[in-house]
Amino acid sequence: MATTKRKTARAVTPNLGVERAYKRAMEKLIDEMSNSFEYWLAAAYKANPPRMEVAMDALPSAELSKKVRDLGKRWIKKFDDMASAIAQKFTESGRKATDSSFQQALKDAGFAVEFKVTPVMRDAMNATIAENVSLIKSIPRQYSMEVEGIVMRGFTQGRDLKSITDDLQSRYGITRRRAANISRDQANKLTATVTQARRVELGLFEAEWIHSGGGKEPRQSHVKAGKDRKKFDVRVGCLIDGEHILPGQLINCRCSSRTILPF
């Protein structure tokens, strides 16, 4: 007797609008921070043009270091002040978008539901907010530490303004790319978190792995899981490479999954 194929609901993927809005919010602060450091650097050069033989006398290294650190502290405080609001907006927007997409996917499969913010969902969102606050706060700390090294080396070596500014621009590009990676990675994780919580609430415990097909260096184990349409218990995760994981949970994982319906 042939086995009846069980119905599935289409996969829920991250909302690109939410991801881009999150990226833009971080980029706006990064742009302002980078411009601030470059403006300060130009002013410092105008006041004390570094020459190898007098650089340390014109602006002692301890004083220069203090000035860079003071500017860094101001930007650390600004990011700290903004981090919670940015993280909350991203998390709530992502939760709503994922709920809406999953609700429609279930409806299309003949399973109509209405979602509410349950205590379990609230706890999951609070954890997501905390993780993103930490990531946002790390941006100016890493940036200012790198900039201090660039500026200090430039002044003590007597390098011209353009060469140091070029190095700052390179660091700026790295920082913007990090913001893009954070927004993409966290959008994937948020989608996985919300989808898993909703499945558990509804008693929809089984899912089927889908490989994204994207990325320059895909994890071959994820490719195989998608090709095999590997099924897993969403309460535990899919056993891949010796650990139980959810699609989109690991860094740079863009995989998703279909919900297997119990009818």
PLM regions: where:
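Acidic, glycine-rich two-metal-ion catalytic cores of nucleic acid-processing enzymes
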Residues: 170, 174, 178-263
